[in-house]
């Protein structure tokens, strides 16, 4: 008898989990069960015949519904594109399919990726798997929630101001924003094209490395990404030739910025993580980066005009088809003069130069991913933080620097709060230093120990 392979059974199990979780989590806009099972049978036959396309061969993945998928509607979380069925895959999706990944569906996103809560008026809010009364974060909230809840090992997201790292931190997943341009954004509905970045969210750093091996083919090979071929038979990861460690690594911490107006529990957890890395051999060095103080102002002065430039085909003529928050942001963008946008572009370059200079003296930068814990979506517009800062804006304060500088940054779960909510540690590196970043993040995972599953995982098991 020909050898059989368990890929179809694994994909069927993943689809079953998605179905059970959907009423409570709402992580998906579209589930592609029939096509996923057909692709799984092909992958199973290939693997049974000894043909391996890499570590993602036969692995279920989700795709943020901002990213085009051939023959599958891609809504961008909007009413306006609610019936759009692309004729071809986005470049990143094509790379995943070439690597043998099985796309099981399109994950929920904040409308047009223009927000940080994933409270979507057209397809419903994504719920946090640790507490469904709280936000998942966004805009890649569906991808982060699905991974954190154990529905998937890997999902694709996009990050313009923190949209991979924010929900990864709030949901307890690993989220990587690669160097700008490292992964093609072709086929992604744009938010701000000079900042939009495609990247993976995974259950662990190793899962993110597996995705990077597929998304950046020149990185395939254990020396770069630290993953082998895999055989698709189980969720067990292939052996890694590198040994993640901290001795000899210098980590810079811009303390006056990253610990300013931060929830005390988050500051405590991240400082404990830094002490653990120091005890493991890293050198922790406080640094000054005053240029970061203007990141939020610079960021919105770039994102809003670039978003408006794309949406002028529909806005304001179809303003009623937008959610209130996105319509408000686009309306505000109309008041940003060209001079302000051009000044912001210049200041973005100044911020990037400052961060790159700092990375000449240290190997990595570190701090919290977000300054606050997950909050109810109803509080997103309430100025409850120091200085009247809105939660929906606060969550981008620590992620914006690495978006504006176009540097790679990763969020790794580091602790749970007293209320049982995830806290994210953010690490950043120099341009195209993803391998070093992943190795350090993996070393931190080893120090931290196993990460527990959220309460939702037990309810749907």
Residue spans for each PLM region:
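Gly/Ser-rich catalytic/binding loops embedded in alpha/beta enzyme cores
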Residues: 1-160, 275, 280, 357
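Short, well-ordered beta-strand elements within core beta-sheets of diverse protein domains
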Residues: 1-4, 62, 81-85, 196-203, ...
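Small-aliphatic-rich amphipathic alpha-helix that forms the alpha element of a beta-alpha
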Residues: 356, 388-413
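Short helix-loop capping/hinge segments that flank enzyme active sites or metal/cofactor-binding pockets
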Residues: 57-76, 248, 252, 302-356, ...
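Short, surface-exposed loop/helix-turn segments at secondary-structure junctions
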Residues: 79, 83, 342-343, 374-396
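Residue-level signal for inorganic ion chemistry
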Residues: 14, 36, 208, 251, ...
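Acyltransferase
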Residues: 9-11, 41, 264-288, 312-317, ...
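Structural helix-boundary/capping segments
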Residues: 20, 24, 98, 149-226, ...
């Amino acid at each position: 008898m020909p050898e059989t392979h368990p890929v179809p059974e694994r994909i069927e199990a993943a689809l079953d989990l998605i179905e059970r979780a959907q009423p409570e989590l709402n992580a998906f806009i579209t589930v592609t069960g029939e096509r996923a099972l057909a692709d799984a049978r092909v992958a199973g036959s290939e693997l049974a015949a000894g043909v391996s396309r890499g570590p993602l061969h036969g692995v279920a993945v989700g795709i943020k519904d901002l990213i085009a998928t051939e023959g599958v509607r891609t809504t961008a979380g909007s009413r306006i594109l609610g019936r759009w069925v692309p004729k071809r895959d986005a470049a990143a999706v094509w790379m995943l399919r070439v690597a043998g990944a099985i796309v099981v569906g399109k994950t929920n996103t904040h409308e047009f990726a223009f927000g940080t809560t994933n409270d979507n008026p057209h397809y419903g809010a994504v719920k946090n798997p640790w507490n469904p009364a709280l936000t998942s974060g966004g805009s890649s909230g569906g991808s982060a929630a699905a991974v954190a809840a154990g529905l998937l090992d890997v999902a694709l997201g996009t990050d313009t101001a923190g949209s991979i790292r924010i929900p990864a931190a709030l949901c307890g997943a690993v989220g990587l924003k690669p160097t700008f341009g490292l992964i093609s954004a072709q086929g992604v509905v744009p938010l701000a094209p000079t900042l939009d970045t495609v990247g993976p969210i995974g259950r662990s750093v190793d899962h993110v490395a597996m995705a990077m091996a597929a998304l950046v083919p020149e990185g395939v090979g254990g020396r770069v990404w630290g993953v082998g071929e895999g055989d698709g038979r189980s969720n067990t990861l292939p052996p890694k030739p590198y040994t993640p460690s901290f001795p000899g690594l210098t980590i810079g911490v811009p303390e006056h910025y990253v610990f300013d107006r931060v929830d005390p529990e988050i500051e405590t957890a991240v400082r404990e993580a830094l002490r653990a890395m120091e005890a493991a051999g890293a050198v922790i060095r406080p640094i000054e980066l005053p240029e970061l103080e203007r990141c939020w102002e610079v960021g919105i002065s770039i994102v809003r005009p670039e978003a408006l430039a794309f949406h002028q085909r529909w806005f304001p003529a179809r303003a009623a088809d937008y959610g209130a928050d996105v319509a408000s942001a686009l309306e505000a963008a109309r008041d940003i003069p060209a001079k302000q946008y051009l000044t912001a572009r210049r200041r973005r370059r100044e911020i990037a130069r400052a961060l790159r200079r700092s990375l000449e003296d240290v190997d990595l930068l570190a701090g919290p991913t977000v300054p606050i814990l997950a909050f109810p979506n109803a509080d997103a517009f309430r100025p409850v933080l120091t200085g009247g800062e809105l939660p929906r804006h606060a969550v981008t304060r620590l992620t914006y620097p690495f978006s504006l500088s176009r540097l790679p940054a990763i969020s790794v779960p580091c602790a749970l709060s007293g209320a049982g909510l995830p806290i994210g540690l953010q690490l950043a590196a120099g341009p195209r230093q993803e391998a070093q970043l992943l190795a350090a993040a993996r070393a931190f995972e080893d120090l931290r120990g196993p990460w527990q599953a959220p309460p939702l995982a037990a309810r749907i098991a």
